[in-house]
Amino acid sequence: MAAKDVKFGNDARVKMLKGVNVLADAVKVTLGPKGRNVVLDKAYGAPTITKDGVSVAREIELEDKFENMGAQMVKEVASKANDAAGDGTTTATVLAQAIVNEGLKAVAAGMNPMDLKRGIDKAVVAVVEELKAISKPCETSKEIEQVGTISANSDETVGKLIAQAMEKVGKEGVITVEDGTGLDDALDVVEGMQFDRGYLSPYFINKPEAGTVELENPYIILVDKKISNIREILPVLEAVAKAGKPLLIVAEDIEGEALATLVVNTMRGIVKVAAVKAPGFGDRRKAMLQDIAILTAGTVISEEIGMELEKATLEELGQAKRVVITKDNTTIIDGIGDEAQIKARVAQIRQQIEDSTSDYDKEKLQERVAKLACGVAVIKVGAATEVAMKEKKDRVDDALHATRAAVEEGIVPGGGVALVRAASKVAATLTGDNEEQNVGIKLALRAMEAPLRQIVTNAGEEASVVARNVKDGNGNYGYNAGTEQYGDMLEMGILDPTKVTRSALQFAASIAGLMITTECMITDLPKEEKLDPAAAMGGMGGMGGMI
């Protein structure tokens, strides 16, 4: 086991604080409408330019191991805020730095760290309740646009795109961000249910100019097994041909003779048919087939429940107004499924989302909800260079998470005003069990001014003057650093999602409290490199001296 280096008391805290400040100082320059960029060196390729707090925090690793422990703990604040709300990482870092700095001053002055922590925790609980009280619902498209604009660093085009996307696919819909091909941002909306499986043979294509298969009012057969024998599906093909409608086959796979026969029948015009593989794998495939069945009022033909493909009838087939199949995707538009059954299925999947502990599973379940309920929107980010594209994608991603958070828990005045107002209200009534808890409460409430002060500092103004003016005001009155004007923050469109502000405060206070109560730090001693004796002698010089 490696030898350890141990530091106690003030020595440990001073080192830890230095690491906290290095990381937080790098992150906080990005805060606000006039925040600056940070350039991150990469081992390969061009450097990355970002204004995303968590991206900056993740890059920082310090040489001194004690300082690095402090930096890593603040990095955890940014990561947790990012995981919970997808935004507010810089605010969380600024709050953590302010609480740690104020708290360690009090500890150095002889205060009891545990009582200070209890005071900080009480202040945070009270302020969170106050934030919930001043929060208002985010319902209109205009408010969603404003939240998106602020989170994308005052980029109005991003705010507008997100608002349009939410309008098209609903607040529960899936909105994804992808690289665009041009200089401008674009929004693509996929209506109906789309899954990532394309046609099994290019011979099914009936729109050669677009390279797609389009079926109008088709029957849809859903099969939970491989089809390799054409005799299995022949009765269904004959019934569909008599009905004079096209057929879409969705199966685990269609192989050999069966696929060849389908292609020949399509090319001869005997029956209009297309085949695709079922989406997903294993249990997820079964669930998605059932989703399609409910959407199209069909039945999944599965041997597990004693059904045979040869005996399938038209009543067991689903139907839709239109199906479009490309090389990579299949889209089912306007399935004839019963609205009540679709809603029940959506409710069932939402319950699974609540019960799930895996982020990956939650994401996949959320996609299924969107496909059943509303559709999918894709924001394509345009930029002149790859570096600019990456930076913009980060901002769009932040804005997207912020708007979701705003829809979920509402909005509060932005620009750090909500925390200042909530802290002022709490300061008038909240007291601790002893004097040291009162100090903890006061230092936490004082630290809540830090985001406002940092936004103002980054805008090149005097933080103390602006903070005093804002505190003298009431309600939504605050300072717009973008225009350098005072006024009603909500009317000026400066909004923050309540969830983002709340999460930032809770995670910052939680980890700052742990750091304030730290008394000992332990790390590995650096290993001393032992010199190889032969290397030290410089080798034998090729034994040239022996000749």
From Swiss-Prot:
GO MF, one example: unfolded protein binding
GO cellular component, one term: cytoplasm
Primary subcellular site in the record, as a coarse category: cytoplasm
GO BP, one annotated term: protein refolding
Binding-site positions, ATP: 30-33, 51, 87-91, 415, 496
Keywords, comma-separated and alphabetical: ATP-binding, Chaperone, Cytoplasm, Isomerase, Nucleotide-binding
The protein's role, per its UniProt record: Together with its co-chaperonin GroES, plays an essential role in assisting protein folding. The GroEL-GroES system forms a nano-cage that allows encapsulation of the non-native substrate proteins and provides a physical environment optimized to promote and accelerate protein folding.
Sequence similarity: Belongs to the chaperonin (HSP60) family.
Protein name: Chaperonin GroEL
Organism: Actinobacillus pleuropneumoniae serotype 5b (strain L20)
